[in-house]
């Protein structure tokens, strides 16, 4: 858990030290770059704190998860809107394949949007070049299936089994490339299960990952 906070704090400290350097302070472009770094790491820490609180409340059954009939395609569109700026910054694309004819489920709009945003952010984050993401929906019996597919780094079989654990990190052999999903995917799993659904991942190293969510439709 400490790693989730130590890394951004260390980055912020390094950036502050760099800005204090007399040679750097006169270079507006570099100062702006370091300030952006501080801003990004601060946001990252804030997100981790939010996730800690969410998981804690979930475990104590204190999180308000009131559910209402909702059109899943609307939730997906909302989640995509949330990540659009990050995606545009990386010149990435999201291609939608909405094949589900029945799409109304009993969900908590806020938490289910967070679930999809989390998976989309990971898809963008772990795409080494320009992110190319695909979102699919389909109906299987009385369920809706949502698939979010990326063409990024992919993950090992071990990582696929453990990726929904709190603070699981996959060591790739490169000290500078330790992939951490933090609390995000643990939160995803708890929320999906609270919606009587399932979430799992299919992945291959170097070929990308597909996160699959199944939740029941309203009959």
What residue spans do the PLM features occupy?
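Short helix-loop "hinge" at the ATP-lid/N-box region of the Bergerat-fold HATPase_c
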Residues: 123-124
């Amino acid at each position: 858990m400490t790693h989730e906070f130590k890394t951004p704090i260390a980055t912020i400290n390094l950036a502050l030290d760099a800005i204090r350097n007399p040679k750097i302070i006169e270079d507006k472009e570099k100062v702006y770059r370091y300030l952006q770094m501080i801003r990004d790491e601060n946001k990252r820490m804030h997100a981790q704190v939010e996730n800690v609180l969410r998981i804690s409340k979930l475990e104590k059954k204190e999180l308000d998860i009131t559910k209402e009939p909702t059109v899943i395609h609307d939730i997906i569109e909302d989640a995509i809107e949330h990540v659009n700026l990050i995606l545009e910054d990386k010149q990435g694309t999201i291609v939608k394949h909405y094949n589900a004819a029945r799409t109304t489920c009993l969900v908590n709009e806020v938490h289910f949007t967070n679930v999809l945003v989390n998976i989309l952010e990971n898809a963008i984050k772990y795409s080494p070049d320009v992110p190319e993401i695909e979102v699919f929906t389909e109906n299987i019996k009385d369920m809706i299936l949502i698939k979010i597919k990326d063409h990024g780094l992919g993950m090992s079989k071990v990582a696929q089994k453990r990726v929904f654990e709190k603070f699981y990190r996959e060591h790739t052999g490169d000290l500078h490339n330790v992939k951490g999903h933090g609390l995000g995917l643990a939160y995803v799993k708890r929320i999906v299960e609270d919606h009587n659904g399932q979430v799992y991942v299919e992945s291959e190293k170097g070929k990308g990952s597909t996160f699959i969510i199944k939740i029941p439709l309203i009959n």
